[in-house]
Amino acid sequence: MGTETATLGGGCFWCTEAAMEELAGVTDVTSGYAGGDTADPSYRDVCSGTTGHAEVVQVEYDTAELAYEDVLEVFFTVHDPTTVDREGPDVGSQYRSIVLPHDDQQHERATAFVDELAAADAFDGSIVTEIEPLETFYPAAEKHQNYFEKNPDAAYCTVNVAPKVSKVREQFGARTE
């Protein structure tokens, strides 16, 4: 089979990264930025809300163990796709819900997945997740990579990241590492 990569943004990348790293079959997760117009943005640039970029993660996974839909299922479980430009305490377009497909097949699969969630009334509100083709992914600085692993006792991590990691372990127990 091989590996594939999914690029997703659902609020602060520290949260999404830590949640995705729990999933068996995920071989690498990189925090970064995508979806905007500014070339090679810094964290400070993206946090200003003026770059058009969202905080995202690139999730590399083994297709013998996971399907794209499995990654999407975890993604939609650990963030609220019904709020515009917000996830928990983080507010701004850089925290929007976005799926950035790498090709037409991923675009079709992401659209079908969101349509199924909407048809099932899986959430209390309408899903506002953007689905836009990935143009360029910019990795974040090293200090943002594996942030939860490096800083599990930081206040933001204990309040925001840890509950998402716990949720993945509880809901996807057999599929976590």
From Swiss-Prot:
One GO MF term attached to the UniProt entry: L-methionine:thioredoxin-disulfide S-oxidoreductase activity
Protein EC: 1.8.4.11
Root EC class: oxidoreductase
Pfam families: PMSR (PF01625)
Catalytic activity: L-methionyl-[protein] + [thioredoxin]-disulfide + H2O = L-methionyl-(S)-S-oxide-[protein] + [thioredoxin]-dithiol; [thioredoxin]-disulfide + L-methionine + H2O = L-methionine (S)-S-oxide + [thioredoxin]-dithiol
Entry keyword annotation includes Oxidoreductase: yes
Biological process, per Gene Ontology: protein modification process
Protein keywords: Oxidoreductase
InterPro entries given in the database record: Met_Sox_Rdtase_MsrA_dom, Met_Sox_Rdtase_MsrA_sf
Active-site residues annotated for this sequence: C12
Similarity comment: family membership: Belongs to the MsrA Met sulfoxide reductase family.
UniProt function note: Has an important function as a repair enzyme for proteins that have been inactivated by oxidation. Catalyzes the reversible oxidation-reduction of methionine sulfoxide in proteins to methionine.
Protein name per Swiss-Prot or TrEMBL: Peptide methionine sulfoxide reductase MsrA
Source organism of the structure: Halobacterium salinarum (strain ATCC 700922 / JCM 11081 / NRC-1) (Halobacterium halobium)
Lineage: Archaea, Methanobacteriati, Methanobacteriota, Stenosarchaea group, Halobacteria
Name of the gene: msrA
